[in-house]
Design a protein with these regions (language model features):
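Alpha-helix N-cap/helix-start motif
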Residues: 74, 92, 146-147, 243, ...
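N-terminal [4Fe-4S]-dependent radical SAM core
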Residues: 41-119, 123-125, 129-134, 365
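Conserved Radical SAM active-site core
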Residues: 103-252
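Generic, ordered loop/turn and secondary-structure boundary motif
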Residues: 60, 80-82, 86-88, 93, ...
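Auxiliary Fe-S-binding modules of radical SAM enzymes
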Residues: 2-59, 63-76, 251-371
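Hydrophobic faces of well-ordered beta-strands that scaffold small-molecule active sites
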Residues: 79-84, 135-137, 168-170, 191-193, ...
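Mobile, glycine- and charge-enriched loop segments
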Residues: 77-85, 93, 97-103, 155-162, ...
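Conserved short loop/turn motifs at secondary-structure junctions
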Residues: 84-87, 142, 170-172, 234-236, ...
Length: 371
């Protein structure tokens, strides 16, 4: 859950994300990009080498092809506006090195009880009034074991949000098949459970929950019929190869996630990564390159700029939209971190000729090759 809280703020380190490929690698990536741009449907048989070749394409070529794919599979003027509310803050037993809500670190975040349904309804109404069409609810705990009363309360929250005409999403840690059935019966639209980073780098960030634990939860969500929302965090100290590995995990699932949030680490004082990464900001080209590659290898998926977007210049955000990003988080806060406000984002969309995506009405094209 805390995976949604992420992003950087300080001096920018020299970019490690890009390099100039050898001519043979360029030829291979050009052929792969051309084939991907002409694809009629998503594929789940990507190799890690293929994704690496796409990721390492010269950046402007990469954006050109990702924009082409985006326009073939989506209405490029539509951007989904999502709002995230913390319904249970702090006190999490996990040791995620980036998270303000871990009980293992002194971050100033106090453990709180789950909020009342009425508070959620009020926040959802405000989000809808400001143009948001997906309302997300996050709880800071490891899993849903022994939380039957909380699950009933959250199911009621989901029902109330749905009745407003909003899409509903929750992020509650690990869930089993029976818990997912209850959420599905309540009408849940999507469940967020991030993989965070590559399988190889993951143990450097989290030790209390395995990578396979995360994949099992995602499988439980997928099997329930609820849409999968799963993404990661950039700026944890990983390498470009870990960006490739993170995308490889998502792009080779039995079916692609319905949405992929891309977070930019927000270093939190008191966390291990707050100290390590405070002076090192993941370069923007790495964020853009990851988003563009995600669009190409998961063409029908919603690609969402999540935590840390407030650190990006307006023109950088516009480049992300051009590259295939078609969702953002907006509102007062993202769990415990800053968030771009509704008024600011309405003006952003107006200025760049974009419009909010309607609830339950996402435009997914049946692509035809455009010459």
């Amino acid at each position: 859950m805390a995976s949604m809280a992420a992003a950087s703020a300080s001096k920018t380190a020299p970019s490690k994300a890009t390099h100039v490929p050898f001519p043979s690698a360029l030829n291979k990536s050009n052929k792969l990009l051309a084939e991907s741009a002409a694809a009629a449907a998503p594929r789940t048989t990507w190799t890690r080498e293929e994704i690496a070749n796409i990721y390492n394409t010269p950046l402007l070529d990469l954006i050109y092809h990702s924009s082409t794919v985006h326009r073939r599979f989506h209405d490029p003027s539509e951007v989904q506006l999502c709002t995230l509310l913390s319904i249970k803050t702090g006190g999490c037993s996990e040791d995620c090195k980036y998270c303000a809500q871990s009980s293992r670190y002194d971050t100033g975040t106090k453990a709180e009880k789950i909020v009342q349904v009425d508070e959620v309804i009020e926040a959802a109404r405000e989000a809808k009034a400001n143009g948001s069409t997906r309302f997300c609810m996050g709880a800071a705990w490891r899993d849903m074991k022994g939380r039957k009363s909380n699950l009933r309360k959250i199911s009621q929250m989901v029902k109330e949000v749905n009745e407003m005409g909003l899409e509903s999403c929750v992020t509650l840690g690990m869930v089993d098949a029976e818990q997912m059935k209850q959420l599905k019966d309540a009408g849940l639209t999507a469940y967020n459970h991030n993989v965070d980073t590559s399988r190889e780098f993951y143990p450097s960030v989290i030790t209390t929950r395995s990578y396979d634990d995360r994949l099992q939860t995602i499988e439980n969500v997928r099997d329930s019929g609820v849409k999968v929302c799963s993404g990661g965090i950039l700026g944890l100290g990983e390498t470009p190869d870990d960006h490739v590995g993170f995308l490889y995990t998502l792009a080779t699932m039995p079916s692609h996630p319905e949405s992929v949030p891309i977070n930019r680490l927000v270093p939190i004082k008191g966390t291990p990564l707050g100290a390590e990464q405070e002076k090192i900001q993941i370069p923007f080209d790495a964020v853009l390159r990851t988003a563009a590659t995600a669009r190409i290898v998961m063409p029908s998926t919603i690609i969402r700029l999540a935590a840390g977007r407030y650190t990006m210049k307006e023109t950088d955000q516009a480049m992300c939209f051009m590259a295939g990003v078609n969702a953002i988080f907006t509102g007062k806060k993202m769990l415990t971190t800053m968030c771009n406000g509704w008024d600011e984002d309405k003006e952003l969309l107006r200025k760049w000729g974009l419009k909010p995506m309607k609830s339950f009405e996402r435009t997914v094209k049946q692509p035809e090759l455009e010459l």
